[in-house]
Amino acid sequence: MFVGNRLRITGGFIVRPDGVSQGDLTIENGIIVSMEQVASKEKVKGIDEDRVIDAQGAWVLPGLIDIHCDAIEKEVEPRPNTLFPMDMAFLQFERKLAGHGITTMLHSLSLGVGLSLRGEHLVAEMIDLIASMRAERGMIRHGVHLRYEVSHLTGFGLAERLISDGLIDYLSLMDHAPGQGQYHRPGAFQRYVMKNQGVGLDEVAAIVEELEGRRSRVDWAKLKALTAEARSRGIAVASHDDDSASAVERSLDFGASISEFPLSLGTAQYAYGKGMGVCLGAPNIVRGGSHDGNLKAVDAILEGVADILCSDYHPASLLHSIFKLESEGLSLHKAVAMATINPAKALGRADKVGSIELGKRADVIVVRKVRDIPLVVSTIVDGTVVHATQDFA
C-alpha cells in the first residue's frame, strides 16, 4: 500500500464536477494539489515510481459517499438469531466497502421495535463501536445515520442522548404504520407482517392494534424539538417514504431537507420543487425498478427531480448505478455527482470531500470495466491507498 506523503495517478479519465478529461492527479499530505488536463510523462520531483498509479485509461472518480445503507445488519446477523461479534463484522465489512469504492459510509441503524440489531441495546452498542473505530483507525470514513421510528416511544430518550453526545451524523424519521409510507395501500402492512413473521390474521390484527395504539401516543411537539436540536448541531434531517405532497409538507415542517425514497414521481417532483434533496436507491436502478412496485428511480432522475443515490441495502450497486445511468443517457459527471458531491452537500461536507478539486481531501477511486461491469481497482482515502487489486492474467 502507498502510505507516503505524495501520490500521483497518471493517465486516467478524471471525472470532475463539470466534465471528464484525461490527465494526471497529484496528491500531497492527503490533499489534491494539482490536476493536469493532459497526461504528462514527466516524473514529478519527490515522487518515486512506486508512488505512482498508472490508471491506463481507467476512470478516476471521487470516492463514493453513501448516506443510507443498512447492510451492516446482515454482516452482524447473516441469519435470524445468529449474531457475530460486532467488531469482527464491522472490520470485515469495511474491507468490502473499500472494494466497492465507498470512501464515506453512513451506516443506517434503525431505532425501532424489534429484536436483533434494530433493538435499542444493539443499536447503541454498534454506534459506540463506530465512534471508537473512528477515533482509533479506519480504511474509510464512517458515520451514523440514525433511522428513528416515530412510534418507538421508549427509544426517544436514546435518540436524544445520541444526538446530544455527538454520535449521529444524519437523522431520518420513519413511520412504518399501516396506511403510512410504503404501507399506504390498504392491507399492505398486514401482508408484509404475515409474510415476514409467519403469523396469522388474528396475530397480525393484534400487532396492528398495538402499533396504532403507540402511534396515537406520539408526542409530535417533542419529535419536532428533537429534529430542531439535530439541525442546530449540523445534522441533516430526512423524511422516509413520502407518499404525497401533504407528506412532504409535514416533513418540511419537521425541518427535513432530504426526502428518501418518495413513492411516486409526483411526490419526488413536489419534494424537489420545494428545495429538498431527493434520495433514491441504487438497487432500483441496477435492477430496473422498485422491488415493491413503487417509483422507478431512473424515471425521476431523467426527469431531473432526484439528485442523490444511496446503496440502500446493497453496497455494490452504488458504483454500478452510476454507469447504468450513463447508459440511460445521463452524462457521466452528473451521474457521479449523485453519489459524491450531492450527498456531500446534503451533509454539509462539500468543502472537504465529494469531488476532485484542488484543495480537497484526496478520497479517490480508480475504476475500469470487466465484461462491461465497473470494478474498483484502487481506493484512496485521505491520500492513502487502502484498497488495490490486479487480475493475475
Where do the model's predicted regions map?
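His/Asp/Glu-enriched, well-ordered alpha-helical/loop segment
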Residues: 274-284, 288-369
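C-terminal cap of metal-dependent C-N hydrolases
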Residues: 12, 340-341, 345, 357-393
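Histidine-rich, glycine-flanked metal-binding segment
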Residues: 1-8, 14-61
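Metal-associated gating/positioning segment near the N- to mid-region
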Residues: 55-127
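Active-site glycine- and acidic-residue-rich loops that bind
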Residues: 146-157, 241-246, 250, 258-260, ...
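Glycine-enriched alpha-helix->loop->beta-strand junction motifs that scaffold or abut catalytic
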Residues: 165-169, 251-258, 273-279, 304-307
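Metal-coordinating catalytic core of metallo-dependent amide/deamination hydrolases
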Residues: 111-242, 312
